[in-house]
Amino acid sequence: MEFSVKSGSPEKQRSACIVVGVFEPRRLSRAGEQLDEISEGYLSTLLRRGDIEGKIGQVLFLHNVPNVLSERVLLVGCGKERELTETQYKQIIAKTITTLNDTGALEAICFLSELHIKGRDTYWAVRQATEATQDCLYNFDKFKTNKENTRRPLRKLTFNVTSRKELARAELGLQHALAVASGAKACKDLANMPPNICTPLYLSEQAIALGQRFEKITTEIVDSEQMAELKMDSYLAVAKGSANPAYMSLMHYNGGNADQKPIVLVGKGLTFDSGGISLKPGEAMDEMKYDMGGAASVFGAMKALAKLNLPINVIGILAGAENMPAGNAYRPGDILTTMSGQTVEVLNTDAEGRLVLCDVLTYVERFEPDCVVDIATLTGACIMALGHHISGLMTPHKGLANELLSASNQSSDKAWQLPMDDEFQKQLESPFADMANIGGRPAGSITAACFLSRFTKSYTWAHLDVAGTAWRSGANKGSTGRPVSLLTQFLINRSENETTAVNS
């Protein structure tokens, strides 16, 4: 699909469809008023008649509006003008795109990016509208034999901004959105793959393919034999019961100077998590293919990064493994020696993600990173705490926390910081090893982060728990593509700071 931005009056636009807003109660937006004027009150007559109230979710599709150059006019309900929220804005865009895609209009000019959202500018409006459009049009039908084809799908969408002065910001928003949307799609496609196809080996093959596509990405694969030589025994224990061996995929993006320390993104890549010997309930176990959502988001962020050609160095790691029960699988009661030399008593084999990540977090010390961010569908406790709308952020480093929260706010890919006070560490005590792999039910997300923190002492580190945000259940089941937008914004901000430092 083709996107563009422009600045112009609605009455001068010649297109298959022009989209304008209607506010409650029955009041046209500025662009709507301009169309109403040239149509000699045609639109306002419809409003007075009650054809559309302006409530969010309402649409009115019109053909042959008098004196309007465009073939069609789509009136979209935008709610109360002064109370419009960010979430409502994205809902309005989604409703617009769904309607347009069903009408047979091949192109459209949209004036909804002119809507006022408190604290947001044109850059944000265009970026969010573009990302929401791509999300709305996403469909994963790779394995369907009877595919549903839209009669005449929307092929071109132009966002109109209020003045020419806003064009530069709008174009930047569009550029960033297209990169993020491309990364989010890559994340969704990878996460939605069935686990009989998306194995740890498959993850490594996708990482290699990404490196072949982008000149600045070099991919390195660490297989199980190499992990054994590195004494990554905690990681390997998780994969022991599976017929699919573990693979750790490292994507090195070299966009900065050779002496610039890399940012490291680590994604938990459990391509299927049965729980192991501590077997999960059968209900919804199919969704445990999404336990590689962290790795999928790192993969997507690396693609977005490469498309934006940012001047920084980043290493994206996909920590691939599969957790299955078997006669040789690891057990509750086992004591594992991690790559760091610290020992862990396994109390629950379904708390496996941290056992994979702890060895990867030790492995990345060799890169002397600027910072490390791990992304993982780590705990059900995070869903209990924050639901399905907000990712959990945990870090002992205030500066990095502020950066990630700022990126969250800028991208509207929400995260919330949870505490990591020393008192929580006591819950991980074991009478037989240096620590246990779980700390009991209370504050489960926090104690999981505390566990990981014991392997990150040599660098600045943060943990994103995306257990509640990486995928949706129910009728619209599927990967959300999160937190690709947050991660990409974090990297954009870092690159801008790097450029400023170089030029100062």
Curated annotation (Swiss-Prot):
InterPro entries documented for this protein: Leucine_aapep/pepB, Macro_dom-like, Peptidase_M17_C, Peptidase_M17_leu_NH2_pept, Peptidase_M17_N
Subcellular location: Cytoplasm
Binding site for Mn(2+) 2: 268, 273, 291, 352
Top-level EC class: hydrolase
Keyword Magnesium: no
UniProt cofactor(s): Mn(2+)
Catalytic activity line of the entry: Release of an N-terminal amino acid, Xaa-|-Yaa-, in which Xaa is preferably Leu, but may be other amino acids including Pro although not Arg or Lys, and Yaa may be Pro. Amino acid amides and methyl esters are also readily hydrolyzed, but rates on arylamides are exceedingly low; Release of an N-terminal amino acid, preferentially leucine, but not glutamic or aspartic acids
UniProt keywords, alphabetically: Aminopeptidase, Cytoplasm, Hydrolase, Manganese, Metal-binding, Protease
One Gene Ontology molecular-function label: manganese ion binding
GO cellular component: cytoplasm
One Pfam family linked to the record: Peptidase_M17
Active site: 280, 354
Binding site for Mn(2+) 1: 273, 350, 352
Gene Ontology biological-process entries: proteolysis
Cofactor note: Binds 2 manganese ions per subunit.
Record-listed E.C. numbers: 3.4.11.1, 3.4.11.10
Family (UniProt): Belongs to the peptidase M17 family.
Purpose: Presumably involved in the processing and regular turnover of intracellular proteins. Catalyzes the removal of unsubstituted N-terminal amino acids from various peptides.
Protein's recorded name: Probable cytosol aminopeptidase
Lineage: Bacteria, Pseudomonadati, Pseudomonadota, Gammaproteobacteria, Alteromonadales
Gene: pepA
